[in-house]
Amino acid sequence: MKREILLERIDKLKQLMPWYVLEYYQSKLAVPYSFTTLYEYLKEYDRFFSWVLESGISNADKISDIPLSVLENMSKKDMESFILYLRERPLLNANTTKQGVSQTTINRTLSALSSLYKYLTEEVENDQGEPYFYRNVMKKVSTKKKKETLAARAENIKQKLFLGDETEGFLTYIDQEHPQQLSNRALSSFNKNKERDLAIIALLLASGVRLSEAVNLDLRDLNLKMMVIDVTRKGGKRDSVNVAAFAKPYLENYLAIRNQRYKTEKTDTALFLTLYRGVPNRIDASSVEKMVAKYSEDFKVRVTPHKLRHTLATRLYDATKSQVLVSHQLGHASTQVTDLYTHIVNDEQKNALDSL
């Protein structure tokens, strides 16, 4: 979603919210939470407060009038009723064969509410230096997570990774084979952004950065000589990330056409651009997700940009057998998150079994 559209939608949602949600928004903006995260949270609050009005828990006329006391006095039974409402409301689910939203969606909703409650009961300060209230009903609400061993998760993910020669094969496919399948009109559209698309995908595969980190890169953040990019990690921390050498020609090809193709001015600082009505804009995450899905589905299997991050991490662990190195590359504080890659690269275990 383009930044301008995202901010417009955020403003519309903010106009609906109670004052304490607006305070929460400002507080999290200072952390900083990304606008995308805050937008998703505001959507969840809109859903929750709409239910509060519909269920009669509050007799306010509109969401913005719902008093803070409603959240303070919300019972565990009330919150469980909201969860049941989500499970049983079919219109919330695009798949009409299901009765309600998925458990993943419910967990996301509860996560947003937990964040709001934590702010109101622990983080915010009133004039006396105390939180607005102390009772946090969300601490009493259980969430159900999908039970799956690391080995099972690794096996599922492995099918959606471009390991070994498939990394370069994927890029070669986009560059050489994909255009041969296109109509003249589709080919013209493809050629307009070919170098940019290849540069983005090559960078994701060669660095393992998150999608948000990639789209927020500025031109000055790329050191092509050293093959290093400076990114803003989760929590606003700056980090320097090494980029594998195979991405260099794709980045060079894009930079060679960037200014002329996208009609840039000195004020256009974003590394990856898109043209909208003849005006260059920073490419948004949604556009990259669609692009990766399209190319990957044609090549092998439909994947998300996050699977390209998993691809880099798995290849790096396979080459080094170092969880510490992989953790540093991905920007993780501990090696626990990288345990997954030791299960994906399990040739030693399989070889041992084969020798029995």
Curated annotation (Swiss-Prot):
GO BP terms in the entry: cell division; chromosome segregation; DNA recombination
Residue ranges annotated for the Core-binding (CB) domain, each copy included: 16-121
Regulation: FtsK is required for recombination.
Any single GO CC term annotated in Swiss-Prot or TrEMBL for this entry: cytoplasm
A Pfam family annotated for this UniProt entry: Phage_int_SAM_1
Gene Ontology terms, MF aspect: DNA binding; site-specific recombinase activity; tyrosine-based site-specific recombinase activity
Catalytic residues as annotated in Swiss-Prot or TrEMBL: 210, 234, 306, 309, 332, 341 (o-(3'-phospho-dna)-tyrosine intermediate)
Tyr recombinase domain location: 169-354
Alphabetically ordered keywords of this record: Cell cycle, Cell division, Chromosome partition, Cytoplasm, DNA integration, DNA recombination, DNA-binding
Subcellular localization(s) per the UniProt record: Cytoplasm
Location (main, coarse): cytoplasm
Additional free-text comment from the UniProt record: In contrast to the XerC-XerD complex present in non-streptococcaceae bacteria, XerS acts as a single recombinase required to recombine difSL recombination site.
Biological function: Site-specific tyrosine recombinase, which acts by catalyzing the cutting and rejoining of the recombining DNA molecules. Essential to convert dimers of the bacterial chromosome into monomers to permit their segregation at cell division. Required for resolution of chromosome dimers frequently formed by transformation.
Family: Belongs to the 'phage' integrase family. XerS subfamily.
Protein name from the UniProt record: Tyrosine recombinase XerS
Organism: Streptococcus pneumoniae (strain ATCC BAA-255 / R6)
Phylogenetic classification of the source organism: Bacteria, Bacillati, Bacillota, Bacilli, Lactobacillales
